[in-house]
Design a protein with these regions (language model features):
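Low-complexity, Pro/Ser/Thr- and charge-rich linker/hinge segments at domain boundaries
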Residues: 16-32, 109-147
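Aromatic (Trp/Tyr) and acidic
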Residues: 36-105, 110, 128, 133-197, ...
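Solenoid-like repeat scaffolds
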Residues: 377-386
Length: 604
C-alpha cells in the first residue's frame, strides 16, 4: 500500500494485469479486529483497533451495551511496521458467555463468541481437512460432508495401472511398488515423505499434548466408532503410506509423484503415471522419527501396528547409522517436482536430529543419545533455527524432545532448555512489544507458508510454557492462534469454514466449491513473492477476497493457473489473469494443517 493509502495498479511488461487491493481498515476490512471465532471466558480478550477506541462499546447479540472502553484500558501501540496500520490494543476483560460486537463511531468489528467451548468446532474442522486429502479412496456420504455441504469423489483415486513405477528405471517401466493410503500433499495430487512424515508426527504430538481433546466418533470418518480416537485413525492413513516406501535395506524412497504436475481433478480422474522417487536420507530420517513415535502412541490401541512401526523405525535408524552422508533423491529429466530437503540449498541435519530424538525417546537407543549430543554441539543447532522453524529443519522438535526428557544427562537437557528459552524469550518480546497485532513474525518473516511458520513459532512457545511453567509463553502462543483466526491486519480467519474464513480456495480438488470444505489453512501473506500487493506492508501481501471472473476469461477453478502457458513470467504472476487466486498465498498443504492441529491442542 502506498503512503497515501491509494490502491496500486500492478503492471507486468506492457500489460496492466490486476489491481492490488490490500486490506484497508474501514474500507475493505473492519477497523476493529477480533478473533472471528471468539475467546474462551477465562482467556484475555485482546482486540486490535485501527481507530481510537476510547468510548467504544461492546454490544451483546440483542444490541444492548454491556461495557464501554475506558481510556485506562487502552494501549496506544502506534504504527505497526508489518501492516502500516495505526494500532490500539484493548483487553475486553470479563465477558459472560454470548455473542458480541464492538463499535467505535462508524467502525465495527465482526461478531465473535465468548464461551467455554468456543474452539471445539475449529479443532474438528482442522482435523477434518485430512479426510478430504485422502488418496486411494472414494469420498462418500455421510463422511464427505460439512454443515450440509457435500464434497464427494465418486471413485478411489490413484489406484490405476500407472501407479508405483520405480523412478530409478525412468523412462522404462520395469519395477513397480505397491503403495497404500496417504494424503495428497497440497492442491496437487503428489505425495512426499518429507512433508507427510512431519505432518503425521505433528498430529501424534497433538494427541499426546492434550489427549482429552481427541475422541472416537469426533470427525465423522469411516473409521469412527472403532474405539480409537479419530485423530489416530486419520494419522494412520498417512503412516501406512510411509511404511509402503521402505526398501529392505531400511532406506525410504522420497515420494510418489508425477513427472510434471497433476491435472486439476477430480482426483479420481487423474490417470497420470506416478513414479516412486529414489532413496533419500532426509526422507529416511523423518520416517524413522514419526514411526518411532507411532510405535508408542498406537500400542494401547493396536499392538501389532505399533510393532510394525517400531520394526520399520529401527531398520531406518540402522540404515542412517551406517550411512552418515546426505543421500539426495533425484528426479526425472525436465521434471517440475520439488525435492524438498534434497534440494541443493538444504541438508539432512534437522531430519537426522529429530530421528535421533525420537529413536531415543521410544527405544532408549545408546547410539541415538550419542547423536543427540553431537547435534546439540553442532553450530547448525542454534537459537535461530529453533526460533525460525520450517518443514526443512526439524531441529526445534529435536530440541523439544531433549528439553522435556527425564533420562538424558542433565548437561544435555540444560543445553536444549537454554536454546528453547532463548527462542521463546525472543518470540515473547516480539509478541508483547514488537508487533501491533501481537504476531510473532518479524517483518522479514512473511514468505511462502507464513501461516504455517507462524504456528511453528507458537508451538515453540507452548513447549517453553510447559518446560518452564511460564504462563507468559502460553499467552504469547495463544496470540498466534488469535492471529490465524482473524485478529490480523487482513481482518479474516485464515482457515476455511472457521470464523470469517476464505469463501473460496482455488488450489484444491474442490476449488470451484462455494463454500469450500472445512479446515483448510491457507499459506498466508507472502511478501517475498507477492510484495507488489502491499509494497510497504508485508503482513498484507495477500488479497482478502477472490473475484469470480478472471481478467483472462479463464473461469476460476481449482488449478486454473496450471493452464497458463506463461505461468512463471512476470515475477510469479501469470500474465493475462488476475492475481487473487494465486497459489503463493492461497495454496493449502497438509503440513500447514498439522501445525494448526498441533497448536490448537497445545493452547487449549
Amino acid at each position: 500500500m502506498s503512503g497515501d493509502g491509494a490502491v496500486k495498479t500492478v503492471q507486468l511488461g506492457k500489460q496492466v494485469n490486476a489491481q492490488a487491493a490490500p486490506a484497508q481498515p474501514g474500507v475493505n476490512v473492519p477497523a476493529i479486529k477480533v478473533d472471528t471465532v471468539g475467546y474462551p471466558e477465562a482467556w484475555p480478550k485482546v482486540v486490535v483497533f485501527n481507530v481510537n477506541p476510547e468510548g467504544a462499546v461492546v454490544k451483546d447479540a440483542g444490541g444492548q451495551v454491556v461495557t464501554t472502553i475506558e481510556a485506562s484500558a487502552v494501549v496506544d501501540f502506534g504504527l505497526d511496521e508489518a501492516s502500516q496500520d495505526p494500532v490500539w490494543q484493548v483487553d475486553l476483560g470479563t465477558l459472560a458467555a454470548g455473542r458480541y460486537t464492538i463499535e467505535a463511531g462508524d467502525a465495527a468489528s465482526d461478531a465473535f463468541e465468548v464461551g467455554p467451548s468456543v474452539y471445539d468446532q475449529a479443532l474438528v474442522a482442522a482435523q477434518k481437512h485430512f479426510y478430504f486429502q485422502r488418496t486411494r479412496t472414494a469420498l462418500v456420504e455421510p463422511y464427505a460432508t460439512w454443515e450440509g455441504d457435500s464434497y464427494l469423489r465418486a471413485n478411489a483415486s490413484h489406484v490405476h495401472e500407472d501407479v508405483g513405477w520405480d523412478l530409478l528405471d525412468f523412462p522404462a517401466k520395469k519395477r513397480k511398488w505397491t503403495v497404500e493410503g496417504g494424503w495428497h500433499d497440497a492442491g496437487n495430487f503428489d505425495m512426499y515423505i518429507p512433508s507427510t512424515a512431519p505432518t503425521s508426527q505433528a498430529l501424534l504430538m497433538a494427541y499426546e499434548a492434550n489427549p482429552k481433546l481427541f475422541a472416537d466418533n469426533q470427525l465423522n470418518i469411516p473409521e469412527s466408532g472403532n474405539g480409537v480416537p479419530d485423530i489416530l485413525d486419520e494419522t494412520r492413513w498417512g503412516l501406512v503410506w510411509i511404511l509402503s516406501l521402505q526398501e529392505d535395506s531400511g532406506v525410504f524412497r522420497a515420494n510418489e509423484a508425477v513427472v510434471k504436475w497433476t491435472p486439476e481433478g477430480p482426483a479420481d480422474t487423474d490417470k497420470t503415471e506416478r513414479w516412486i522417487a529414489g532413496p533419500s536420507s532426509s526422507a529416511t530420517a523423518k520416517a524413522a522419527a514419526v514411526l518411532a513415535r507411532a510405535s508408542t502412541v498406537y500400542r494401547p490401541f493396536d499392538a501389532a501396528f505399533a510393532d510394525r512401526c517400531a520394526a520399520s523405525a529401527k531398520k531406518a535408524w540402522a540404515w542412517l547409522e551406517a550411512n552418515p552422508e546426505h543421500l539426495r533423491a533425484s528426479k526425472a529429466p525436465d521434471s517440475d517436482q520439488p525435492l524438498w530437503d534434497d534440494e541443493p540449498e538444504f541438508n539432512d541435519f534437522g531430519a537426522r536430529f529429530i530421528a535421533a530424538a525420537e529413536t531415543w525417546r521410544a527405544f532408549g537407543d545408546a547410539s541415538a543419545q550419542a547423536k543427540l549430543e553431537a547435534a546439540l554441539a553442532d553450530e547448525r543447532c542454534n537459537q535461530k533455527e529453533v526460533l525460525g522453524g520450517a518443514w526443512a529443519n526439524l531441529s526445534r522438535w529435536g530440541v523439544a524432545v531433549v528439553a522435556t526428557d527425564t533420562k538424558l544427562p542433565k548437561a544435555l537437557v540444560d543445553k536444549a532448555r537454554g536454546l528453547l528459552r532463548g527462542a521463546a524469550d525472543t518470540l515473547r518480546e516480539r509478541v508483547e512489544s514488537g508487533d501491533g497485532y501481537r504476531c510473532a513474525s518479524g517483518p522479514d518473516d512473511y514468505y511462502w507458508a507464513h501461516n504455517s511458520n507462524l504456528l511453528e513459532k507458537a508451538h515453540v512457545l507452548t513447549v517453553a510454557a510447559e518446560v518452564f511453567d511460564e504462563p507468559a509463553y502460553l499467552a504469547a502462543a495463544r496470540d498466534q492462534w488469535h492471529w490465524i483466526l482473524g485478529r490480523n491486519p487482513n481482518g479474516y480467519s485464515m482457515v476455511t469454514r472457521v470464523g470469517k474464513g476464505p469463501t473460496r480456495i482455488y488450489h484444491m480438488e474442490w476449488g470451484n466449491a462455494e463454500p469450500p470444505p472445512p479446515g483448510y489453512l491457507v499459506g498466508g501473506p507472502n511478501y517475498s513473492n507477492m510484495g507488489f500487493l502491499a509494497p510497504d506492508a508485508p503482513a498484507k501481501a495477500l488479497l482478502w477476497d477472490n473475484p469470480a471472473p478472471l481478467r483472462s476469461g479463464v473461469p476460476a477453478n481449482a488449478m486454473w493457473h496450471w493452464k497458463q502457458e506463461d505461468l512463471w513470467e512476470g515475477g510469479f504472476v501469470p500474465e493475462g489473469s488476475w492475481t487473487e487466486g494465486w497459489w503463493a498465498v492461497t495454496e493449502p498443504d497438509i503440513i500447514y494443517n498439522a501445525n494448526l492441529v498441533l497448536v490448537g491442542a497445545s493452547v487449549l
